[in-house]
Amino acid sequence: MEDKRNIQIIEWEHLDKKKFYVFGVAMTMMIRVSVYPFTLIRTRLQVQKGKSLYHGTFDAFIKILRADGITGLYRGFLVNTFTLISGQCYVTTYELTRKFVADYSQSNTVKSLVAGGSASLVAQSITVPIDVVSQHLMMQRKGEKMGRFQVRGNPEGQGVVAFGQTKDIIRQILQADGLRGFYRGYVASLLTYIPNSAVWWPFYHFYAEQLSYLCPKECPHIVFQAVSGPLAAATASILTNPMDVIRTRVQVEGKNSIILTFRQLMAEEGPWGLMKGLSARIISATPSTIVIVVGYESLKKLSLRPELVDSRHW
């Protein structure tokens, strides 16, 4: 009898790399389009002082939609799409690191922990400059600014974000901070995303394994993998949200010290300030994680070398 708890993990050496990258870029773009509005909302909630403008995720969604229309929810999106590069670097580093660690440990938890942290280190080194620019674009609202910089608006004062205004933000960052400005908050990003990634993968495999005990033998593995993803994302989000709030403020407000930013946040808003944007983060993470997990597992299945297709149970 087959052990239903034996979830077969497709490793790097099992993949057709050409298929893996082509399908991967398409899948990542679809995910970005679907969850970007909540990424923007989370950023604004984390930066605003108290509840000066928005009273929560739903309130922010309605106000942005009324004020700026659907395009207001996609400010900075074109710039943000360049993170597709870091996304591919992330999965490549993750899979290669798992393969490397497998020579020293067969523990799936150890492989996931080390690979997740390493992948995030590589990805954040590419992502941070893109994030800095896109976050400043996210903070523009009808010609008003919530961050340090303000782009030029059109004659009607709508402040529509275009490539010219992206260049304007880049110019202002260079003038204010030089090239170092594009890596503002780099350490804070590493302190946010390395633990987030290192925690997510082990919890994902842990939840999937536990759910496999509860599911009938006939239940496809992809079902409890799809449930495990959001559970792992919620767990990681709760654990790392305080650092994510600090990271966002450092990058958008031009802070130079993580510790001083933390102290200021605590003085202004108390411990609850560290949980700002958590609901938006979980809301955006839940559907995206389901798509990522189902998509990533399906992507790996589609990218299997032909001779291995029949050897995998789903």
Curated annotation (Swiss-Prot):
Solcar repeats (start-end): 18-100, 107-210, 220-302
Molecular function GO labels: branched-chain amino acid transmembrane transporter activity
**Localisation per UniProt entry:** Mitochondrion membrane
Membrane-topology descriptor: Multi-pass membrane protein
Q: What induces it?
A: Induction by cold exposure in brown adipose tissues.
Gene Ontology process terms (BP): amino acid transport; branched-chain amino acid catabolic process; branched-chain amino acid transport; regulation of cold-induced thermogenesis
Q: Per the record, what are the reactions this protein catalyses?
A: L-valine(in) = L-valine(out); L-leucine(in) = L-leucine(out)
Keywords noted in UniProt: Amino-acid transport, Membrane, Mitochondrion, Repeat, Transmembrane, Transmembrane helix, Transport
Major site of localization recorded for this protein = mitochondrion
Q: Which Gene3D superfamilies match?
A: Mitochondrial carrier domain
Q: Which GO terms describe its cellular component?
A: mitochondrial membrane; mitochondrion
- InterPro entries registered for this protein in UniProt: Mit_carrier (IPR002067), Mitochondrial_sb/sol_carrier (IPR018108), Mt_carrier_dom_sf (IPR023395), SLC25A44 (IPR042164)
**Transmembrane region(s):** 20-42, 71-90, 113-133, 185-201, 222-239, 278-296
Q: What does this protein do?
A: Mitochondrial solute transporter which transports branched-chain amino acid (BCAA; valine, leucine and isoleucine) into mitochondria in brown adipose tissue (BAT). BAT is involved in BCAA catabolism and actively utilizes BCAA in the mitochondria for thermogenesis.
Similarity-based family? Belongs to the mitochondrial carrier (TC 2.A.29) family.
Q: What is this protein called?
A: Solute carrier family 25 member 44
Say which species the protein is native to. Answer: Homo sapiens
Gene name of this polypeptide: SLC25A44
